[in-house]
Amino acid sequence: MRLTQGCFSFLPDLTDQQIEKQIAYCIDKGWAMNVEWTDDPHPRNSYWELWGLPLFDIKDIASVMFELSEARKSCANGYIRMNAFDASYGTESCVMSFIVSRPSNEPGFYLERTEGAGRFITYTIKRYSVQANAEGSRY
């Protein structure tokens, strides 16, 4: 199952050249970049681990790509995404986010149904990877 979160998630994986073009676009807009990673990409897990420090005031694409390269080396079996943050007045939010690296095997999710009193039914999204392995060794 292919995880689809963020921009470009329904497209094939971006090449490094395509990632560089997206970074250039973000830098041209004046947005700060950062790299995040996780081994638990649950749809409600919006807070991934920050790789290094946010790249404020970086105007060099190579610096951002270096941080991405280091994250790929260290977190090869996890998910890595790039975020762009617009700090301008009135926005002050993440304006672009896209996955740049993913594990070779993505086990996916399943829906667990629980029946309660009075025909009350709840559904919970569960991860196959969390059931099988402890945190840090899921992929």
From Swiss-Prot:
**Quick one: signal sequence residues?**
none
Q: Name one GO molecular function term.
A: ribulose-bisphosphate carboxylase activity
* Predominant location: plastid
Question: Per the record, GO CC terms?
Answer: chloroplast
Q: Does the keyword Nuclease apply?
A: no
Record InterPro entries = RuBisCO_ssu, RuBisCO_ssu_dom, RuBisCO_ssu_sf
Per UniProt, subcellular location reads as: Plastid, Chloroplast
Q: Which domain of life is it from?
A: Eukaryota
Kindly give the CDD domains that the UniProt entry links to this protein: RuBisCO_small
Could you provide one GO biological process annotation from this protein's UniProt record?
reductive pentose-phosphate cycle
Query: Record's Pfam families?
Result: RuBisCO_small
> Could you tell me the keywords of this UniProt record?
Calvin cycle, Carbon dioxide fixation, Chloroplast, Photorespiration, Photosynthesis, Plastid
Any further remark recorded for this protein: In this alga, in contrast to plants, the small subunit is encoded in the chloroplast.
Whom does it interact with, and what assembly results? Heterohexadecamer of 8 large and 8 small subunits.
Question: Into which family does the record put it?
Answer: Belongs to the RuBisCO small chain family.
Q: What is this protein called?
A: Ribulose bisphosphate carboxylase small subunit
Q: Which organism is it from?
A: Trieres chinensis
